[in-house]
Amino acid sequence: MPRVKGGTVTRKRRKKVLKLAKGYYGSKHTLYKVANQAVMKSGQYAYRDRRQKKRDFRKLWITRINAAARMNGLSYSRLMHGLKVAGIEVNRKMLADLAVTDAAAFTQLADAAKKAVAK
């Protein structure tokens, strides 16, 4: 029987990859070589999309704020400028949440922005 050098390390590495590939379709969860490629690619997708998610949510918040602002007779850019001039520091996430859940509070902020821009 030939001597095996690093056999336990190799087995551990392969088991780790196959564990990460659990739930993949077809041979991607059983064959090491294919599973390794799939796991590497999924890691690339995960890395890319963690950054993409931040952009997607910001786009969603801006869309919601713009829709609510236009219902109050303002564009998104004028609303944001008015809030900045008025000294109201509310981030886009909170503004979007107010626009969806509490329209009255958002209207008050929009009115404050209108007054600040009018000055």
From Swiss-Prot:
Any one GO molecular function term: structural constituent of ribosome
Assigned keywords, A-Z: Ribonucleoprotein, Ribosomal protein, RNA-binding, rRNA-binding
InterPro entries in alphabetical order: Ribosomal_bL20, RIBOSOMAL_L20_CS, Ribosomal_protein_bL20_C
Pfam family of the protein (one): Ribosomal_L20
Similarity comment text for this entry: Belongs to the bacterial ribosomal protein bL20 family.
UniProt function note: Binds directly to 23S ribosomal RNA and is necessary for the in vitro assembly process of the 50S ribosomal subunit. It is not involved in the protein synthesizing functions of that subunit.
Name this protein carries in UniProt: Large ribosomal subunit protein bL20
Native source organism of the sequence: Lysinibacillus sphaericus (strain C3-41)
Gene giving rise to this polypeptide: rplT
